[in-house]
Amino acid sequence: MSVKEQPHVPQPIVAIADVTFFKRSFGVCVIRAPHLKKNLYAQEVQTESVDAYKQGRINLEDRGYTIKAIVLAGRPGVRQLFGDVPIQMCHFHQKQIIARYPTNNPKLAASIELKKITDALCQTNERDFTDTINKWHQKRSSFLKERTTDPLTGKWFYTHKRLRSAYRSLKINLPYLFTYQK
């Protein structure tokens, strides 16, 4: 039994774009229109690059689609490519970024708190999330500034650099985390 393909109807869309890898150098760049319940673009890629997303956008626009907003994984170059439309950072990807820095099973109180704040990302709004993350930073500011000196070289480095990176990621991505609420 064959599946009847739905007719192609160019229209304004809210798109979700991401690259999924199945092997180290084999992935697929997909742009999906969730309200249509279909993938509008798919292309095999070896690496996740801005060009892969650019080709997808060109393909959709050439076929008559107008991207009204897009959900992205958060790669900065890709954001620039879609800078003319509202961009929503994927909450799953933001949580994965946070889990990657201080780990998914943190031991330090500051890391546990930041993970808890991030876990609530899908159940909050921009104002409350911003207030919470700012209060956390104010409380943990001196902890984040702690430095360790290497006894061999005499050079210093931030003791909690992975936690600092996690916080910085949230601050950089904050303008894109609640686009859907605007």
Describe every region a protein language model picked out:
Residues 1-85, 162, 169, 173:
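RNase H-like nuclease fold core
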Residues 49-53, 90, 122-129:
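Intrinsic-disorder/low-complexity, polar/charged segments
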Residues 65, 72-76, 118-182:
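Acidic/histidine-rich catalytic cores and adjacent linkers
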Residues 36, 62, 87, 100-108, ...:
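Alpha-helix capping at helix-to-loop junctions
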Residues 4-5, 9, 32, 88-97, ...:
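Short, Lys/Arg-enriched charge-dense amphipathic segments
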Residues 70-115:
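Conserved beta-strand -> loop -> alpha-helix junction used to position metal-binding or nucleic-acid-contacting
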